[in-house]
């Protein structure tokens, strides 16, 4: 999903918090949600990768969305979660503070972000989503990473170095 969706359709969105804001993401690419119990740091990984986890024999890079969007925030959530999702860069884990709920929203309700807000992180923000008494920020999973970061991830060797068994 890289642009505002066509009208008259309904989206299922998962709501989650990162720092002070509530974001939403289309659940179509969501594979599962798991508790964050830590990750393995890989020295050769690009800087935007917090670490890796192995889930069902698959190595999954973890991106800390809080660190990307709010690097100035020092406090950390007690029990962060990881959204395991499909992207053009492959399967990635997005570390978030908390997951709230799933909502159904008509695409007619989506509002384009004002031009001044688009500059915060380029095309990451797709739309503003008014829902009941709240306002959510719809983000594009494909734009969590820049083109250069996607290439770096594709080229990265995320296999942890083997330890000497001597």
Regions from the PLM with identified roles:
Residues 1-166:
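An acidic, low-aromatic, low-complexity terminal/linker signal
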